[in-house]
Amino acid sequence: MMNRYICIHGHFYQPPRENPWLEEVELQDSAHPYHDWNERIAAECYAPNAASRILGSGKKVSRMVNNYASMSFNFGPTLLSWMERHAPEDYQNILAADKESQARFSSHGAAIAQVYNHMIMPLANARDERTQVLWGIRDFEHRFGRKPEGMWLAETAVNTRTLEILAEHGIGFTILAPHQAARVRKIGEEKWTPVKDAGVDPQMAYVCPLPSGKKIHLFFYDGPIAREVAFADLLESGVNFANRLLGVFPRDQHHPRLVHIATDGETYGHHHSFGDMALSYCLHHIASQNLAQVTIYGEYLEKFPATHEVQIAENTSWSCAHGVERWRSDCGCKIGGHRGWHQKWRAPLRQALDWLRDTLAPFYEEHMRAFAADPWAVRDSYIEVILDRDTQNVENFFKQNCRAELKAEEKVKVLRLLELQRHAMLMYTSCGWFFDEISGIEGVQILQYAGRVLQLAQELFGEDFEGHFKKILEAAPSNIADLCNGAAVYEKFVVPARTDLTGVGAHYAVSAMFDDHTGGKKVYCYTVREQVYDLKQTDGRTFVIGRLYVRSDITWEEGSVDFVVVPGEGQHLSAAVRASMSEEDFRDVHQEMEKVFTSGDVREIDRLTERHFGATQYALKYLFRDEQKRIFDEVIHSAMEEFEEHFREIYEHYYPLLQAKEELHIALPKALNTCIEFILNRDLLDLLAKEQTDIGALKRIAVEVKRWAFEIDKTRISFVAMQRIIFLMRSLEKDPRDLRRMESIDDILRATAPLNLDLDLWRAQRSYLAIARQVFDGSLPTPEPRWLELFRKLGDHLHVHSEQSEHSERSV
């Protein structure tokens, strides 16, 4: 019987990045060329791990495998929620992998659950810990269609109370770092053996007896190998990775042994480029050579029940040498890179959030008891609404959790109370403390969640809690002199992000001027309908006045908003917005302002605007981030076209100088070089974006760029070229007989070769292999020799080699 077992666990997680008021991730410039970091990491890691390439002869792709089906993994619930909306194909591949793994691992699934929003459990109160576990379990059941056997703890942070809560809710096991074991003993023996600095023996399962009489199984991963995977170069070779795992099995092995590691899942592709391929080849090499049995924790436990007991080291984690201090003190653990920076801000940040949570808890209880006997049980059940905000599902939630039929305003209040509690847990997401500076993107994110809590608290309870909250944050020093402290960070990054029905109405009012508005639309998690929208234009000036109905799809809050957009300085527009006035007042204001605008009296328009709507502001400031970027791009588009026209004249006029530059070895003036590079970049992007690419022009420009060493925007051009090739390959997959499309793909690949673009074409390669399978299994009629010749050439340029495509050629 095989006694050598290997399990690789990936903890796939990103902190929630959604704007708390909009429930969507806004544009993040640092993730360029992607929209945001979720999108970028999904492209680099989550997606390719579902179709990871295994290389054959000539270092060409021979097949692709779903890594998730052969490893143990967990995904953060908030990340899966984002993927379900924005990367549905990749999301479905993850769910499918869990089902596939059940056939492979004795009906045990590869996926395990995670505490809901990555809260450091030992630092949470028991009530939040319980909700985190309940929400994590229910989210898992909703997505994977089964109960989870195990659960991942954020940062593997643990104490006995946390384990008790896991066991209470049916969780069978969790995974910890080796230094988190305190002492062990063989089942049936009385004497405990302390675990020394070297750590616990990681090659077996342990059972942890709990004070309540319950128990939970614990796996302690191999620390040295995990560190080499995460922080060294072990992923440069799948064979080396496999050999490193195999190398720690005892030579004289008579009993089953489990070699297993746990790392951030993002290690496989995001932190280490093409790390997914090292993982897939490692697993393939081990299985195909019968070097060990690849398994997962649930299967291993069933086959080999624990023979030893363990007690944990209390309040420890995998990423802090000081226990869990990284998330509440200046313990010295940090990312580094900023010499002299401290983390003295961590303690006051946690103190501020703890104060906010504990201060608002009695208010929540008092107000929720008007609708339900157990306010905290209602919060536990709220995950059903978070998972499905369909109106009927929310109505069912009210019926199941509230005492009586609720009025419309009562439903709004219940939802607001529960949203306050949801954000009061989101604000404890661990990443807010993990990094070096409170004003970093992660610190700002949890402060924004706190900002949403404060806004809801003021609206619900009529009290201002913000002042004292900021007072505590004043004791959280920033490392950046201009930001001073946490209170200043809050004022700079949180307060401007806050919005409400009026803010959403202002966004719509301005954005509608740049759209073909159709009477209303969705604005993130709000529904907007036009009640009045009157646009007037005269002598190049624009005036809009209107009324909008705005409704939150989250809290069901609704109301009307009045707005006006008027000419500002220069070509700018100014806008003002307010809660709706009476019908009669609005009608009078509408008529008065329209009359004055028609007369051309700009000063009077400004006076009336301030009188009836309040102070105006530059219209684009009312827009949310993505719409600001879109409209700004539209506004400057005409200017860019004008630049292009002038630059193109220069480019064409001085083109002969390029030949002289080469023959005489003379450098072009920098200004002329800039003009030429601008045109070459524009032409490359335009050619690659067109449905029918002019291959001749593409070849000519690529040759010019290489010949004369012009600089191109390789990141952007690579991204556009990659998207174009993937699109064409997917189209070809739907209609493999389309020779012209196949030729077009091959032509683009050959034409862009001189540019040395960074093309990660795994999606195109997957389509190629799918077409090859159609030929191999006979679902595609035997192709003509010309098709096979071109298909083989395309495979060469895509660096794909498959038995299916070879077999297809031999069968003709």
Identify the residue ranges that each predicted region occupies.
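Conserved short loop/turn motifs at secondary-structure junctions
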Residues: 118, 148-158, 264-268, 439-444
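Extended alpha-helical scaffold segments
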Residues: 651-812
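Short His-Asn-centered micro-motif
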Residues: 73, 152-156, 176-178, 219-221, ...
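Acidic, His- and aromatic-enriched active-site or binding-groove loops in soluble protein domains
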Residues: 92-110, 134, 146, 167-210, ...
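CE4/NodB-like, metal-dependent polysaccharide N-deacetylase domain
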Residues: 129-153, 246-260
